[in-house]
Amino acid sequence: GVFAANHFSEIKNVLRPVLTLADTAHALLGSGVMSTLTKSMHHAIGVPQWTPAMPKAYNPESVKKEIIQKSTQPQPENLKVVYFPSCINQTMGLARKSPEEQPLVNKMVSLLHKAGYEIIFPDKMENLCCGTIWESKGMPDVADSKAAELETALLQASENGKYPVLCDQSPCLYRMRHTIKQLRLYEPAEFIYTFLQDKLEFRPTDKPIALHITCSMKKMGLGDQITALARLCSNNVFIPEEVGCCGFAGDKGFTHPEVNAYALRKLKPQIEKKHIDIGYSNSRTCEIGLTTNSGIAYVSIVYLVDQCTLKKEKI
């Protein structure tokens, strides 16, 4: 636990080739053979269960360099944001068969630029983590140490709280709000709803979409915010009934997929009945489980907002 915390960027650098290897095997074997093979291995030796919703590897270094190279005239204070991409979104990109083309970090950057924001990344963000991983493994001291390290980096990046901080994963933001008290912290739905509404022109679609409200959003009292944001983008928002917690529970959906499947057993029939082909949420791991058990792709609500908005022209 302590070793992983102290060598976090190296751990992610090990994980990326594993994801790439799995994706290459998927490309060569196809979804059916790959699913059967890994299911057998999961039952035999306990390796994580692979599904076609598993992501490809991702590294945000290229988008960071692009922002530095393209940085133009600095924006006023009210148009600056510190963006901390969560560990999972720094490591995991899109699934091979995702309907989207850009990984979430790239899409978040694109949307913020559309709204006229200057983006500040915290220094050495590849080493940073909110600590949720260690907290879930029963290592609170390590978790709090990582949270303190993150707080120091975010205070520096935000010039002691002058700018809001955006994290793209709702469970991470939930823990950050409990451990970091000096900063204004947001996940994508609340940030967009609060700060970007007047900077974007919304053009809602009539296409039906599914919305999953994560447990962390409910705990933070933000279920209404993400629902209202979805309704700015679509005139046909469907929130499935009797589908509460998705059951993915951090990384347990990889090691105990049957819990995820049971929690979402009532999802797919409702999706099929409504003829919906895309769903939105704001937690990458939840979206992996939702995609696996619904028969449709679930992605971040950031993609929906970007798809349904134009830059608002100044009058």
Stretch-by-stretch model annotation:
Residues 1-315:
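Iron-sulfur cluster-binding electron-transfer modules in prokaryotic oxidoreductases
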